[in-house]
Amino acid sequence: MKDIKVIIAGPRGRMGHEAVLLMERTPHFQFVAAVDYKHGGEKISDLPGMPALDVPIYEDLHTCLDEIEADVLLDLTTPEVGKKHVTLAVEHGLRSVIGTTGFTEEELQHLTNIAKEKEVGTIIAPNFAIGAVLMMKFSQMAAKYFQDVEIIELHHDQKLDAPSGTAVKTVDLIRQHREPKQQGHPNETEQLKGVRGANVDGIHIHSVRLPGLIAHQEVLFGGDGQMLTVRHDSFNRASFMSGVKLSIETVMNLDHLVYGLENIMD
C-alpha cells in the first residue's frame, strides 16, 4: 500500500497519544506533523510519554498546512476546534478524518456540500470502535421489531459534550425504522426536572459522566414479556485504533463526506 502522510491534531490527548503509537507501528503511515496550540515549535519527542519521533509540532493548522505536505488530517481535538479544522482542511483540499463530535445537522450539511464541491474525502466518525458501530447497527435492526427503546450512554467525566455522538447517531439509525411515539404513561410527570433524560421522538437518552469510565453504551428495547439489551464497552483508547486505521486508509479513495464508520464498513 502506498504511504499515507498524516497530520495529527490533538496529539497530547489520550486518543491522540494512541494515534501517535498507531503511526509508529503502521509501516504505510507517515506521521509528518502535529498540531498543538501549547507546544508549537517543539517535536513530538519533546512531549512527556511520547515515542522518540522527530515530528514537528505546529501551533495552528493554518501554518502547518502552509509548510507541510500531507494526505490526511486526523483531528482528535475538541468539538469547537474540530469544526474549525475540518472546514479549513476541506477548503485546502486536504482529506480529513474527524474523531470529534457535536456537529449539528446544519453543520454536517454545510460540510457535506463543500466536500462535494471540492471533491475532498472526509470522514466524521462519532465512534471509531468497530464493536460500537456493530452495536449501532444491531440496534437499528432491532428497532424494526421493538418500538419502545431507551439509551444509556456512559463516559469519563472529562467528556465535553452530552449526549455522546454515538448516542445521537444511534437515535438517527433507530428513527429510520421507528415512527415517533410517546413512550411510557401518557400522563407521566417528572418530579425532578430532567430525570427522564433527553427525549427525541419518544426515545429517552440518559448520559452518565464518572471517573473510571471510558466509553460505554447500552440500548434497551422493551416488549411484552421480554427485553433486549444491546451493549458495547470500550475499556481503553486502543479499542478505537482499528477504526482510525480503517478511516485513514478509506478516506484516500473518497471524494465526498461520509458520516459514521458504519458507512465505510463492508
Swiss-Prot record:
Please name the Pfam families in this protein's record.
DapB_C, DapB_N
Active site per the UniProt annotation = 155, 159
- Keywords assigned: Amino-acid biosynthesis, Cytoplasm, Diaminopimelate biosynthesis, Lysine biosynthesis, NAD, NADP, Oxidoreductase
PROSITE patterns named among the record's database cross-references: DAPB
Domain of life where this protein originates = Bacteria
The first-level EC class reads oxidoreductase
Which pathway is it part of? Amino-acid biosynthesis; L-lysine biosynthesis via DAP pathway; (S)-tetrahydrodipicolinate from L-aspartate: step 4/4
InterPro entries given in the database record = DapB_C, DapB_N, DapB_N_CS, DHDPR_bac, NAD(P)-bd_dom_sf
Sample GO molecular function, one term: oxidoreductase activity, acting on CH or CH2 groups, NAD or NADP as acceptor
Per the record, what is one GO cellular component? cytosol
Q: What is its EC number?
A: 1.17.1.8
User: Could you tell me what this protein is called?
Assistant: 4-hydroxy-tetrahydrodipicolinate reductase
